Amino acid sequence: MPAYRSRTTTHGRNMAGARGLWRATGMKDSDFGKPIIAVVNSFTQFVPGHVHLKDLGQLVAREIEAAGGVAKEFNTIAVDDGIAMGHDGMLYSLPSREIIADSVEYMVNAHCADAMVCISNCDKITPGMLMAALRLNIPAVFVSGGPMEAGKVVLHGKTHALDLVDAMVAAADDKVSDEDVQIIERSACPTCGSCSGMFTANSMNCLTEALGLSLPGNGSTLATHADRKRLFVEAGHLIVDIARRYYEQEDERVLPRSIASKQAFENAMALDIAMGGSTNTVLHILAAAYEGEIDFTMDDIDRLSRKVPCLSKVAPAKADVHMEDVHRAGGIMSILGELDKGGLINRDCPTVHAETLGDAIDRWDITRTSSETVRNFFRAAPGGIPTQTAFSQAARWDELDTDRQNGVIRSVEHPFSKDGGLAVLKGNIALDGCIVKTAGVDESILKFSGPARVFESQDSAVKGILANEVKAGDVVVIRYEGPKGGPGMQEMLYPTSYLKSKGLGKACALITDGRFSGGTSGLSIGHVSPEAANGGTIGLVREGDMIDIDIPNRTIVLRVDEAELAARRKEQDAKGWKPVEQRKRRVTTALKAYAAFATSADRGAVRDLGDR
Protein backbone atom coordinates (compact mmCIF):
# COMPACT_ATOMS: atom_id res chain seq x y z
CA MET A 1 0.00 0.00 0.00
CA PRO A 2 1.47 3.42 -0.95
CA ALA A 3 2.44 5.59 2.02
CA TYR A 4 1.18 9.15 2.18
CA ARG A 5 3.91 11.25 0.59
CA SER A 6 3.48 13.89 3.26
CA ARG A 7 4.64 11.51 6.00
CA THR A 8 8.16 12.08 4.71
CA THR A 9 7.92 15.50 6.40
CA THR A 10 5.42 14.83 9.21
CA HIS A 11 6.52 11.54 10.79
CA GLY A 12 9.59 10.43 12.71
CA ARG A 13 11.89 11.98 15.28
CA ASN A 14 14.21 13.44 12.66
CA MET A 15 11.35 15.48 11.16
CA ALA A 16 10.96 17.59 14.29
CA GLY A 17 12.23 20.64 12.42
CA ALA A 18 9.84 20.13 9.51
CA ARG A 19 6.93 19.60 11.90
CA GLY A 20 7.92 22.78 13.69
CA LEU A 21 7.63 24.65 10.42
CA TRP A 22 4.32 22.96 9.59
CA ARG A 23 3.05 24.07 13.01
CA ALA A 24 4.04 27.63 12.14
CA THR A 25 1.63 27.43 9.17
CA GLY A 26 -1.22 26.51 11.52
CA MET A 27 -1.06 22.71 11.65
CA LYS A 28 -1.87 20.97 14.94
CA ASP A 29 -1.06 17.54 16.38
CA SER A 30 -4.31 16.15 14.98
CA ASP A 31 -3.35 17.24 11.45
CA PHE A 32 -0.22 15.10 11.19
CA GLY A 33 -1.28 11.95 9.39
CA LYS A 34 -4.08 13.56 7.41
CA PRO A 35 -3.59 13.90 3.63
CA ILE A 36 -1.96 17.21 2.74
CA ILE A 37 -3.72 18.60 -0.31
CA ALA A 38 -2.10 21.30 -2.43
CA VAL A 39 -4.56 23.94 -3.59
CA VAL A 40 -2.89 25.12 -6.78
CA ASN A 41 -4.38 28.53 -7.47
CA SER A 42 -3.63 30.98 -10.27
CA PHE A 43 -5.17 34.22 -9.02
CA THR A 44 -3.84 37.41 -10.57
CA GLN A 45 -5.21 40.90 -11.12
CA PHE A 46 -3.66 40.95 -14.60
CA VAL A 47 -6.10 38.49 -16.18
CA PRO A 48 -9.94 38.72 -16.26
CA GLY A 49 -10.12 34.94 -16.27
CA HIS A 50 -8.27 34.86 -12.94
CA VAL A 51 -9.18 38.12 -11.22
CA HIS A 52 -12.00 36.43 -9.27
CA LEU A 53 -9.99 33.44 -8.04
CA LYS A 54 -8.44 35.06 -4.94
CA ASP A 55 -11.05 33.78 -2.48
CA LEU A 56 -11.87 30.58 -4.35
CA GLY A 57 -8.68 28.86 -3.28
CA GLN A 58 -9.68 29.35 0.34
CA LEU A 59 -13.21 28.16 -0.46
CA VAL A 60 -11.73 24.88 -1.71
CA ALA A 61 -9.34 24.79 1.26
CA ARG A 62 -12.22 25.04 3.74
CA GLU A 63 -14.00 22.14 2.06
CA ILE A 64 -10.81 20.05 2.13
CA GLU A 65 -10.46 20.71 5.86
CA ALA A 66 -14.14 19.86 6.42
CA ALA A 67 -13.61 16.55 4.60
CA GLY A 68 -10.69 15.63 6.85
CA GLY A 69 -7.70 16.82 4.86
CA VAL A 70 -5.10 19.54 5.37
CA ALA A 71 -5.16 22.22 2.67
CA LYS A 72 -2.11 24.26 1.66
CA GLU A 73 -2.52 26.86 -1.07
CA PHE A 74 0.06 28.28 -3.44
CA ASN A 75 -0.12 30.29 -6.63
CA THR A 76 1.25 29.96 -10.14
CA ILE A 77 1.82 32.69 -12.71
CA ALA A 78 -0.79 33.41 -15.39
CA VAL A 79 -0.22 35.31 -18.65
CA ASP A 80 -3.13 37.01 -20.42
CA ASP A 81 -2.63 36.23 -24.10
CA GLY A 82 -4.96 39.03 -25.17
CA ILE A 83 -2.99 41.69 -23.31
CA ALA A 84 0.32 40.13 -24.37
CA MET A 85 -0.85 40.03 -28.01
CA GLY A 86 0.71 42.08 -30.78
CA HIS A 87 4.04 42.86 -29.10
CA ASP A 88 7.02 41.03 -27.62
CA GLY A 89 4.97 40.04 -24.59
CA MET A 90 3.56 37.19 -26.68
CA LEU A 91 7.04 35.60 -26.76
CA TYR A 92 6.44 34.66 -23.12
CA SER A 93 3.01 33.08 -23.40
CA LEU A 94 3.78 29.52 -24.50
CA PRO A 95 6.99 29.24 -22.45
CA SER A 96 4.91 30.20 -19.41
CA ARG A 97 3.16 26.84 -19.79
CA GLU A 98 6.40 25.05 -18.94
CA ILE A 99 7.08 27.47 -16.06
CA ILE A 100 3.64 26.70 -14.63
CA ALA A 101 4.12 22.94 -14.96
CA ASP A 102 7.56 23.17 -13.37
CA SER A 103 6.38 25.43 -10.54
CA VAL A 104 3.61 22.98 -9.62
CA GLU A 105 6.13 20.13 -9.63
CA TYR A 106 8.57 22.15 -7.54
CA MET A 107 6.03 23.07 -4.86
CA VAL A 108 4.29 19.70 -4.69
CA ASN A 109 7.47 17.62 -4.62
CA ALA A 110 9.45 19.96 -2.36
CA HIS A 111 6.71 19.81 0.28
CA CYS A 112 5.61 16.21 -0.38
CA ALA A 113 1.93 17.01 -0.98
CA ASP A 114 -0.31 13.97 -1.33
CA ALA A 115 -2.79 15.31 -3.89
CA MET A 116 -3.89 18.57 -5.48
CA VAL A 117 -6.82 20.64 -6.65
CA CYS A 118 -5.87 22.72 -9.70
CA ILE A 119 -7.72 26.04 -9.97
CA SER A 120 -6.99 27.20 -13.50
CA ASN A 121 -8.77 29.05 -16.27
CA CYS A 122 -6.91 30.75 -19.10
CA ASP A 123 -4.85 29.73 -22.08
CA LYS A 124 -1.58 28.32 -20.71
CA ILE A 125 -2.62 27.76 -17.12
CA THR A 126 -4.90 24.76 -17.60
CA PRO A 127 -2.38 23.07 -19.95
CA GLY A 128 0.52 23.77 -17.59
CA MET A 129 -1.34 22.33 -14.62
CA LEU A 130 -2.50 19.36 -16.71
CA MET A 131 1.09 18.64 -17.70
CA ALA A 132 2.09 18.80 -14.04
CA ALA A 133 -0.71 16.46 -12.97
CA LEU A 134 0.33 13.83 -15.50
CA ARG A 135 4.00 14.31 -14.69
CA LEU A 136 3.48 13.92 -10.93
CA ASN A 137 0.71 11.29 -11.16
CA ILE A 138 -0.80 12.00 -7.76
CA PRO A 139 -4.58 12.36 -7.21
CA ALA A 140 -5.79 15.58 -8.85
CA VAL A 141 -9.06 17.37 -9.54
CA PHE A 142 -9.39 20.34 -11.90
CA VAL A 143 -11.83 23.20 -11.41
CA SER A 144 -11.56 26.30 -13.57
CA GLY A 145 -12.72 29.86 -13.03
CA GLY A 146 -15.34 29.57 -15.76
CA PRO A 147 -16.17 31.49 -18.93
CA MET A 148 -16.99 35.18 -19.16
CA GLU A 149 -20.46 36.30 -20.16
CA ALA A 150 -20.68 37.40 -23.78
CA GLY A 151 -20.84 41.13 -24.36
CA LYS A 152 -24.12 42.65 -25.53
CA VAL A 153 -24.39 45.93 -27.39
CA VAL A 154 -26.95 47.82 -29.45
CA LEU A 155 -25.43 49.45 -32.53
CA HIS A 156 -27.57 51.35 -35.01
CA GLY A 157 -30.73 49.75 -33.68
CA LYS A 158 -29.46 46.16 -33.77
CA THR A 159 -28.38 44.01 -30.80
CA HIS A 160 -25.06 42.18 -31.14
CA ALA A 161 -23.36 39.51 -29.01
CA LEU A 162 -19.69 40.42 -28.67
CA ASP A 163 -16.34 39.10 -27.56
CA LEU A 164 -12.72 40.25 -27.50
CA VAL A 165 -12.15 39.51 -31.20
CA ASP A 166 -14.96 41.86 -32.22
CA ALA A 167 -13.15 44.72 -30.49
CA MET A 168 -9.90 43.92 -32.28
CA VAL A 169 -11.51 43.61 -35.71
CA ALA A 170 -13.53 46.80 -35.26
CA ALA A 171 -10.44 48.77 -34.22
CA ALA A 172 -8.63 47.78 -37.41
CA ASP A 173 -11.61 48.45 -39.70
CA ASP A 174 -11.49 51.95 -41.18
CA LYS A 175 -15.23 51.73 -41.90
CA VAL A 176 -16.06 51.56 -38.17
CA SER A 177 -16.26 54.97 -36.49
CA ASP A 178 -14.19 55.85 -33.42
CA GLU A 179 -17.42 56.15 -31.45
CA ASP A 180 -18.56 52.65 -32.40
CA VAL A 181 -15.12 51.19 -31.68
CA GLN A 182 -15.29 52.66 -28.18
CA ILE A 183 -18.79 51.26 -27.62
CA ILE A 184 -17.66 47.81 -28.75
CA GLU A 185 -14.49 47.97 -26.65
CA ARG A 186 -16.47 48.84 -23.51
CA SER A 187 -18.98 46.04 -24.11
CA ALA A 188 -16.82 43.17 -25.41
CA CYS A 189 -15.58 41.80 -22.07
CA PRO A 190 -18.25 42.59 -19.46
CA THR A 191 -17.38 40.21 -16.61
CA CYS A 192 -14.68 38.13 -15.01
CA GLY A 193 -13.98 34.78 -16.63
CA SER A 194 -12.19 33.34 -19.63
CA CYS A 195 -13.08 35.00 -22.95
CA SER A 196 -16.60 33.99 -23.94
CA GLY A 197 -16.08 32.05 -27.19
CA MET A 198 -14.63 28.62 -27.94
CA PHE A 199 -11.15 30.05 -27.63
CA THR A 200 -8.17 28.25 -26.12
CA ALA A 201 -9.04 28.71 -22.44
CA ASN A 202 -12.59 27.44 -22.72
CA SER A 203 -11.55 24.67 -25.10
CA MET A 204 -9.02 23.33 -22.59
CA ASN A 205 -11.44 23.56 -19.67
CA CYS A 206 -13.96 21.60 -21.72
CA LEU A 207 -11.34 18.96 -22.51
CA THR A 208 -10.68 18.33 -18.81
CA GLU A 209 -14.28 17.09 -18.62
CA ALA A 210 -13.67 14.61 -21.44
CA LEU A 211 -10.38 13.51 -19.89
CA GLY A 212 -12.28 12.73 -16.69
CA LEU A 213 -10.31 15.10 -14.45
CA SER A 214 -13.01 17.70 -13.73
CA LEU A 215 -16.67 17.78 -12.77
CA PRO A 216 -19.51 18.12 -15.31
CA GLY A 217 -20.10 21.77 -16.17
CA ASN A 218 -16.49 22.78 -15.61
CA GLY A 219 -16.07 23.99 -19.19
CA SER A 220 -19.36 25.83 -19.69
CA THR A 221 -20.81 27.14 -16.39
CA LEU A 222 -20.37 30.92 -16.32
CA ALA A 223 -17.85 32.40 -13.88
CA THR A 224 -20.49 34.79 -12.58
CA HIS A 225 -23.20 32.21 -11.91
CA ALA A 226 -24.02 30.98 -8.42
CA ASP A 227 -24.17 27.40 -9.73
CA ARG A 228 -20.43 27.41 -10.30
CA LYS A 229 -19.76 27.55 -6.57
CA ARG A 230 -20.86 23.93 -6.26
CA LEU A 231 -17.96 22.80 -8.48
CA PHE A 232 -15.43 24.31 -6.07
CA VAL A 233 -17.20 22.91 -3.01
CA GLU A 234 -17.41 19.41 -4.51
CA ALA A 235 -13.79 19.53 -5.69
CA GLY A 236 -12.67 20.06 -2.09
CA HIS A 237 -14.54 17.02 -0.82
CA LEU A 238 -13.76 14.89 -3.86
CA ILE A 239 -9.99 15.29 -3.67
CA VAL A 240 -9.89 14.05 -0.06
CA ASP A 241 -11.99 11.04 -1.03
CA ILE A 242 -9.84 10.02 -3.98
CA ALA A 243 -6.62 10.67 -2.04
CA ARG A 244 -7.81 8.23 0.60
CA ARG A 245 -8.85 5.72 -2.04
CA TYR A 246 -5.33 5.74 -3.43
CA TYR A 247 -3.25 5.86 -0.25
CA GLU A 248 -5.50 3.80 2.04
CA GLN A 249 -7.18 1.41 -0.41
CA GLU A 250 -4.43 1.19 -3.04
CA ASP A 251 -6.91 2.18 -5.75
CA GLU A 252 -4.70 3.30 -8.64
CA ARG A 253 -7.74 3.96 -10.82
CA VAL A 254 -7.96 7.45 -9.29
CA LEU A 255 -4.50 8.51 -10.49
CA PRO A 256 -4.26 10.96 -13.42
CA ARG A 257 -2.45 8.50 -15.69
CA SER A 258 -5.12 5.86 -15.05
CA ILE A 259 -7.95 8.31 -15.74
CA ALA A 260 -6.33 10.25 -18.60
CA SER A 261 -5.33 7.13 -20.54
CA LYS A 262 -4.81 6.99 -24.29
CA GLN A 263 -8.52 6.18 -24.68
CA ALA A 264 -9.39 9.25 -22.60
CA PHE A 265 -7.10 11.40 -24.77
CA GLU A 266 -8.94 10.06 -27.82
CA ASN A 267 -12.23 11.03 -26.17
CA ALA A 268 -10.89 14.51 -25.48
CA MET A 269 -9.66 14.92 -29.04
CA ALA A 270 -12.96 13.66 -30.44
CA LEU A 271 -14.70 16.31 -28.34
CA ASP A 272 -12.24 18.95 -29.52
CA ILE A 273 -12.89 18.09 -33.16
CA ALA A 274 -16.66 17.95 -32.65
CA MET A 275 -16.84 21.34 -30.93
CA GLY A 276 -14.32 23.07 -33.22
CA GLY A 277 -11.94 23.88 -30.40
CA SER A 278 -8.90 26.11 -30.65
CA THR A 279 -5.94 24.77 -32.64
CA ASN A 280 -3.84 25.45 -29.55
CA THR A 281 -5.54 22.50 -27.88
CA VAL A 282 -3.64 20.20 -30.23
CA LEU A 283 -0.37 21.63 -28.95
CA HIS A 284 -1.42 21.21 -25.33
CA ILE A 285 -2.96 17.76 -25.69
CA LEU A 286 0.26 16.50 -27.28
CA ALA A 287 2.31 18.09 -24.49
CA ALA A 288 0.12 16.60 -21.76
CA ALA A 289 0.31 13.16 -23.36
CA TYR A 290 4.09 13.50 -23.47
CA GLU A 291 4.21 14.27 -19.75
CA GLY A 292 2.01 11.26 -19.02
CA GLU A 293 4.18 9.02 -21.24
CA ILE A 294 1.10 8.30 -23.35
CA ASP A 295 1.60 7.33 -27.00
CA PHE A 296 -0.70 9.95 -28.52
CA THR A 297 0.54 11.74 -31.65
CA MET A 298 -0.46 13.84 -34.64
CA ASP A 299 -1.28 10.59 -36.44
CA ASP A 300 -3.96 9.86 -33.84
CA ILE A 301 -5.37 13.35 -34.25
CA ASP A 302 -5.40 12.94 -38.03
CA ARG A 303 -7.21 9.59 -37.71
CA LEU A 304 -9.86 11.04 -35.40
CA SER A 305 -10.34 14.17 -37.52
CA ARG A 306 -11.35 12.01 -40.48
CA LYS A 307 -14.25 10.30 -38.68
CA VAL A 308 -15.57 12.78 -36.11
CA PRO A 309 -18.07 15.36 -37.46
CA CYS A 310 -18.45 18.98 -36.37
CA LEU A 311 -21.40 19.09 -33.94
CA SER A 312 -21.09 22.63 -32.61
CA LYS A 313 -19.96 26.00 -33.90
CA VAL A 314 -19.16 28.66 -31.35
CA ALA A 315 -17.48 32.07 -31.70
CA PRO A 316 -15.25 32.73 -33.55
CA ALA A 317 -16.69 30.14 -35.97
CA LYS A 318 -20.24 31.42 -35.34
CA ALA A 319 -20.16 34.99 -34.11
CA ASP A 320 -23.48 34.99 -32.22
CA VAL A 321 -22.89 31.77 -30.23
CA HIS A 322 -20.87 31.74 -27.00
CA MET A 323 -20.18 29.43 -24.07
CA GLU A 324 -23.36 30.50 -22.29
CA ASP A 325 -25.27 29.10 -25.29
CA VAL A 326 -23.31 25.84 -25.19
CA HIS A 327 -24.23 25.49 -21.50
CA ARG A 328 -27.91 26.08 -22.26
CA ALA A 329 -27.71 23.27 -24.82
CA GLY A 330 -26.37 20.85 -22.21
CA GLY A 331 -22.68 21.70 -22.10
CA ILE A 332 -19.86 19.28 -22.73
CA MET A 333 -21.69 16.24 -21.40
CA SER A 334 -24.31 16.71 -24.11
CA ILE A 335 -21.72 17.00 -26.89
CA LEU A 336 -20.11 13.84 -25.51
CA GLY A 337 -23.60 12.33 -25.41
CA GLU A 338 -24.08 12.92 -29.13
CA LEU A 339 -20.64 11.44 -29.85
CA ASP A 340 -21.60 8.48 -27.68
CA LYS A 341 -24.78 7.91 -29.69
CA GLY A 342 -22.59 7.81 -32.79
CA GLY A 343 -20.19 5.30 -31.24
CA LEU A 344 -17.35 7.84 -31.40
CA ILE A 345 -16.09 7.75 -27.80
CA ASN A 346 -14.98 5.15 -25.27
CA ARG A 347 -17.62 4.98 -22.53
CA ASP A 348 -15.50 2.82 -20.22
CA CYS A 349 -12.87 5.42 -19.26
CA PRO A 350 -12.93 6.23 -15.52
CA THR A 351 -13.39 9.76 -14.17
CA VAL A 352 -12.73 11.46 -10.84
CA HIS A 353 -16.48 11.76 -10.19
CA ALA A 354 -18.09 8.70 -11.79
CA GLU A 355 -17.17 5.06 -12.31
CA THR A 356 -17.04 5.60 -16.08
CA LEU A 357 -17.50 8.43 -18.55
CA GLY A 358 -20.52 6.55 -19.88
CA ASP A 359 -22.15 6.67 -16.45
CA ALA A 360 -21.46 10.40 -16.27
CA ILE A 361 -22.99 11.01 -19.71
CA ASP A 362 -26.11 9.01 -18.83
CA ARG A 363 -26.59 11.18 -15.76
CA TRP A 364 -25.63 14.59 -17.16
CA ASP A 365 -26.72 14.61 -20.85
CA ILE A 366 -29.93 16.67 -20.87
CA THR A 367 -31.40 14.62 -23.72
CA ARG A 368 -31.32 11.41 -21.70
CA THR A 369 -31.56 12.36 -18.02
CA SER A 370 -34.78 12.64 -16.04
CA SER A 371 -33.09 14.66 -13.28
CA GLU A 372 -34.66 18.08 -12.85
CA THR A 373 -31.57 19.07 -10.83
CA VAL A 374 -29.36 18.45 -13.87
CA ARG A 375 -31.74 20.23 -16.22
CA ASN A 376 -31.98 23.21 -13.90
CA PHE A 377 -28.17 23.36 -13.69
CA PHE A 378 -27.93 23.81 -17.47
CA ARG A 379 -30.54 26.59 -17.36
CA ALA A 380 -27.91 28.82 -15.71
CA ALA A 381 -27.91 32.03 -17.77
CA PRO A 382 -25.89 35.25 -18.01
CA GLY A 383 -26.86 38.01 -15.60
CA GLY A 384 -26.07 40.82 -18.00
CA ILE A 385 -24.41 42.95 -15.31
CA PRO A 386 -20.71 43.89 -15.57
CA THR A 387 -18.85 42.40 -12.60
CA GLN A 388 -15.54 40.96 -11.44
CA THR A 389 -17.18 38.86 -8.73
CA ALA A 390 -17.66 35.09 -8.91
CA PHE A 391 -21.08 33.53 -8.23
CA SER A 392 -22.70 36.98 -8.20
CA GLN A 393 -25.90 36.21 -10.14
CA ALA A 394 -28.45 33.40 -10.48
CA ALA A 395 -30.30 34.07 -13.74
CA ARG A 396 -32.03 31.16 -15.51
CA TRP A 397 -33.09 30.45 -19.06
CA ASP A 398 -36.80 29.67 -19.36
CA GLU A 399 -36.04 26.74 -21.65
CA LEU A 400 -33.12 24.51 -22.56
CA ASP A 401 -31.84 24.16 -26.12
CA THR A 402 -32.49 20.49 -26.93
CA ASP A 403 -32.79 20.97 -30.69
CA ARG A 404 -30.24 18.56 -32.12
CA GLN A 405 -31.10 19.35 -35.75
CA ASN A 406 -30.73 23.13 -35.76
CA GLY A 407 -29.55 24.02 -32.26
CA VAL A 408 -26.18 24.95 -30.80
CA ILE A 409 -25.31 21.25 -30.35
CA ARG A 410 -26.16 18.94 -33.26
CA SER A 411 -26.56 15.19 -33.50
CA VAL A 412 -24.23 12.99 -35.56
CA GLU A 413 -27.09 12.66 -38.06
CA HIS A 414 -27.42 16.46 -38.40
CA PRO A 415 -23.87 17.85 -38.07
CA PHE A 416 -22.67 21.27 -39.09
CA SER A 417 -20.30 19.33 -41.33
CA LYS A 418 -19.37 15.67 -41.72
CA ASP A 419 -15.73 16.65 -41.40
CA GLY A 420 -14.74 17.71 -37.89
CA GLY A 421 -13.77 21.17 -36.69
CA LEU A 422 -10.00 20.52 -36.78
CA ALA A 423 -7.81 18.88 -39.41
CA VAL A 424 -4.20 17.81 -39.83
CA LEU A 425 -2.66 18.68 -43.20
CA LYS A 426 0.57 17.25 -44.57
CA GLY A 427 2.73 17.91 -47.60
CA ASN A 428 6.20 19.00 -48.62
CA ILE A 429 5.82 22.30 -46.76
CA ALA A 430 4.72 20.51 -43.57
CA LEU A 431 6.30 17.06 -43.56
CA ASP A 432 5.36 16.49 -39.91
CA GLY A 433 1.98 18.13 -40.25
CA CYS A 434 0.15 21.37 -39.52
CA ILE A 435 -3.25 22.25 -38.06
CA VAL A 436 -6.27 24.15 -39.36
CA LYS A 437 -9.50 24.94 -37.53
CA THR A 438 -11.89 23.88 -40.28
CA ALA A 439 -14.90 24.99 -38.22
CA GLY A 440 -13.80 28.56 -38.92
CA VAL A 441 -13.11 28.13 -42.66
CA ASP A 442 -15.72 29.19 -45.21
CA GLU A 443 -16.74 26.35 -47.53
CA SER A 444 -15.74 28.41 -50.57
CA ILE A 445 -12.04 28.24 -49.62
CA LEU A 446 -11.65 24.67 -48.39
CA LYS A 447 -9.51 24.29 -51.51
CA PHE A 448 -7.24 27.25 -52.15
CA SER A 449 -4.22 28.02 -54.32
CA GLY A 450 -2.27 31.23 -54.43
CA PRO A 451 1.11 32.95 -54.57
CA ALA A 452 3.14 33.27 -51.39
CA ARG A 453 3.56 36.62 -49.66
CA VAL A 454 6.48 35.88 -47.37
CA PHE A 455 7.09 37.63 -44.05
CA GLU A 456 9.92 36.86 -41.64
CA SER A 457 7.94 37.81 -38.54
CA GLN A 458 4.46 38.60 -37.29
CA ASP A 459 5.43 42.26 -36.99
CA SER A 460 6.36 42.60 -40.66
CA ALA A 461 3.19 40.72 -41.67
CA VAL A 462 1.01 43.13 -39.70
CA LYS A 463 2.72 46.11 -41.34
CA GLY A 464 2.28 44.55 -44.77
CA ILE A 465 -1.41 43.79 -44.27
CA LEU A 466 -2.20 47.25 -42.90
CA ALA A 467 -0.23 48.82 -45.78
CA ASN A 468 -2.42 46.91 -48.28
CA GLU A 469 0.51 44.82 -49.54
CA VAL A 470 -1.60 41.65 -49.31
CA LYS A 471 -4.19 41.11 -52.03
CA ALA A 472 -7.10 38.74 -52.52
CA GLY A 473 -5.83 35.32 -53.57
CA ASP A 474 -2.51 35.58 -51.70
CA VAL A 475 -1.15 32.99 -49.28
CA VAL A 476 0.46 34.90 -46.41
CA VAL A 477 3.48 32.99 -45.06
CA ILE A 478 4.76 34.00 -41.61
CA ARG A 479 7.85 32.08 -40.56
CA TYR A 480 10.55 31.95 -37.89
CA GLU A 481 7.76 32.25 -35.33
CA GLY A 482 7.87 28.63 -34.11
CA PRO A 483 8.77 27.46 -30.59
CA LYS A 484 12.49 27.76 -31.29
CA GLY A 485 12.49 30.43 -33.99
CA GLY A 486 10.30 33.01 -32.25
CA PRO A 487 11.17 31.97 -29.71
CA GLY A 488 7.92 31.15 -27.97
CA MET A 489 5.59 30.47 -30.93
CA GLN A 490 3.57 33.67 -30.98
CA GLU A 491 -0.15 33.71 -31.67
CA MET A 492 -1.17 35.35 -34.95
CA LEU A 493 -4.49 36.90 -33.91
CA TYR A 494 -3.57 40.37 -35.14
CA PRO A 495 -2.66 39.30 -38.71
CA THR A 496 -5.88 37.28 -39.05
CA SER A 497 -7.98 40.03 -37.49
CA TYR A 498 -6.47 42.62 -39.81
CA LEU A 499 -7.10 40.39 -42.84
CA LYS A 500 -10.75 40.33 -41.76
CA SER A 501 -10.83 44.09 -41.32
CA LYS A 502 -9.47 44.49 -44.86
CA GLY A 503 -12.22 42.27 -46.25
CA LEU A 504 -9.75 39.45 -46.97
CA GLY A 505 -10.98 36.94 -44.39
CA LYS A 506 -12.46 34.71 -47.09
CA ALA A 507 -10.07 35.73 -49.87
CA CYS A 508 -6.64 34.85 -48.45
CA ALA A 509 -4.89 32.03 -46.64
CA LEU A 510 -2.30 32.35 -43.88
CA ILE A 511 0.24 29.68 -42.99
CA THR A 512 2.81 29.86 -40.21
CA ASP A 513 5.11 27.85 -37.99
CA GLY A 514 3.65 29.98 -35.21
CA ARG A 515 0.22 29.41 -33.76
CA PHE A 516 -3.16 31.06 -33.63
CA SER A 517 -5.34 32.45 -30.90
CA GLY A 518 -8.48 30.51 -30.17
CA GLY A 519 -10.20 33.62 -31.46
CA THR A 520 -8.86 33.09 -34.97
CA SER A 521 -11.04 32.02 -37.88
CA GLY A 522 -10.56 31.91 -41.64
CA LEU A 523 -8.11 29.80 -43.65
CA SER A 524 -5.45 30.02 -40.96
CA ILE A 525 -2.99 27.13 -40.92
CA GLY A 526 -0.56 26.95 -38.03
CA HIS A 527 1.93 24.69 -36.26
CA VAL A 528 3.75 24.00 -39.55
CA SER A 529 6.32 21.35 -38.66
CA PRO A 530 9.25 21.23 -38.83
CA GLU A 531 9.46 24.95 -38.16
CA ALA A 532 11.78 27.19 -40.18
CA ALA A 533 14.37 27.40 -37.40
CA ASN A 534 14.59 23.59 -37.41
CA GLY A 535 15.18 23.40 -41.16
CA GLY A 536 11.54 23.10 -42.19
CA THR A 537 10.48 23.63 -45.79
CA ILE A 538 8.51 26.73 -44.77
CA GLY A 539 11.94 28.37 -44.49
CA LEU A 540 12.53 27.71 -48.21
CA VAL A 541 9.41 29.46 -49.53
CA ARG A 542 10.09 32.47 -51.74
CA GLU A 543 7.92 35.37 -52.76
CA GLY A 544 5.45 34.32 -55.46
CA ASP A 545 5.83 30.55 -55.03
CA MET A 546 2.49 28.83 -55.56
CA ILE A 547 1.01 27.00 -52.58
CA ASP A 548 -1.90 24.55 -52.89
CA ILE A 549 -4.15 23.90 -49.89
CA ASP A 550 -6.70 21.06 -50.01
CA ILE A 551 -8.48 20.59 -46.70
CA PRO A 552 -10.86 17.81 -47.86
CA ASN A 553 -7.84 15.75 -48.93
CA ARG A 554 -5.69 16.94 -46.00
CA THR A 555 -2.80 18.22 -48.14
CA ILE A 556 -0.69 21.37 -48.33
CA VAL A 557 1.92 21.57 -51.09
CA LEU A 558 4.58 24.07 -52.10
CA ARG A 559 4.61 23.92 -55.90
CA VAL A 560 8.41 23.88 -56.26
CA ASP A 561 10.31 20.87 -57.62
CA GLU A 562 12.63 18.83 -55.42
CA ALA A 563 15.81 19.91 -57.22
CA GLU A 564 15.06 23.58 -56.60
CA LEU A 565 14.15 22.88 -52.97
CA ALA A 566 17.44 21.01 -52.51
CA ALA A 567 19.37 23.99 -53.88
CA ARG A 568 17.51 26.38 -51.59
CA ARG A 569 18.12 24.07 -48.62
CA LYS A 570 21.86 24.07 -49.29
CA GLU A 571 21.78 27.85 -49.33
CA GLN A 572 19.86 28.01 -46.04
CA ASP A 573 22.20 25.48 -44.42
CA ALA A 574 25.04 27.88 -45.11
CA LYS A 575 23.09 30.80 -43.63
CA GLY A 576 22.11 28.92 -40.48
CA TRP A 577 18.31 29.01 -40.94
CA LYS A 578 17.75 32.54 -39.72
CA PRO A 579 15.33 35.25 -40.87
CA VAL A 580 16.44 37.20 -43.92
CA GLU A 581 15.58 40.51 -42.29
CA GLN A 582 16.98 41.71 -38.99
CA ARG A 583 14.25 41.61 -36.37
CA LYS A 584 14.06 44.17 -33.57
CA ARG A 585 13.33 41.61 -30.92
CA ARG A 586 14.94 41.36 -27.50
CA VAL A 587 15.44 37.69 -26.68
CA THR A 588 16.25 37.41 -22.99
CA THR A 589 18.12 34.65 -21.20
CA ALA A 590 14.80 33.12 -20.10
CA LEU A 591 13.58 32.93 -23.70
CA LYS A 592 16.92 31.60 -24.93
CA ALA A 593 16.72 28.82 -22.34
CA TYR A 594 13.28 27.83 -23.65
CA ALA A 595 14.40 27.99 -27.28
CA ALA A 596 17.44 25.81 -26.59
CA PHE A 597 15.26 22.81 -25.76
CA ALA A 598 11.94 23.52 -27.53
CA THR A 599 10.67 21.02 -30.10
CA SER A 600 8.43 21.76 -33.07
CA ALA A 601 4.66 21.88 -32.72
CA ASP A 602 4.06 18.31 -33.87
CA ARG A 603 5.50 17.22 -30.52
CA GLY A 604 3.54 19.79 -28.54
CA ALA A 605 6.46 22.26 -28.37
CA VAL A 606 7.67 20.39 -25.30
CA ARG A 607 11.28 20.60 -24.18
CA ASP A 608 13.53 17.82 -25.42
CA LEU A 609 16.34 17.17 -22.97
CA GLY A 610 17.48 14.06 -24.80
CA ASP A 611 16.30 11.76 -22.02
CA ARG A 612 13.52 10.06 -24.00
Curated annotation (Swiss-Prot):
Keyword check for Transit peptide: no
Enzyme class, spelled out: lyase
Keywords: 2Fe-2S, Amino-acid biosynthesis, Branched-chain amino acid biosynthesis, Iron, Iron-sulfur, Lyase, Magnesium, Metal-binding
Positions annotated as active site in the UniProt record: S517 (proton acceptor)
Catalytic reaction equation(s): (2R)-2,3-dihydroxy-3-methylbutanoate = 3-methyl-2-oxobutanoate + H2O; (2R,3R)-2,3-dihydroxy-3-methylpentanoate = (S)-3-methyl-2-oxopentanoate + H2O
Keyword DNA-binding: no
Superkingdom per UniProt: Bacteria
Co-factor binding comment: Binds 1 [2Fe-2S] cluster per subunit. This cluster acts as a Lewis acid cofactor.
Recorded metabolic or biological pathway in which this protein acts: Amino-acid biosynthesis; L-isoleucine biosynthesis; L-isoleucine from 2-oxobutanoate: step 3/4; Amino-acid biosynthesis; L-valine biosynthesis; L-valine from pyruvate: step 3/4
EC number(s) per entry: 4.2.1.9
Subunit composition and interactions: Homodimer.
Protein name, as recorded: Dihydroxy-acid dehydratase
Organism: Sinorhizobium medicae (strain WSM419)
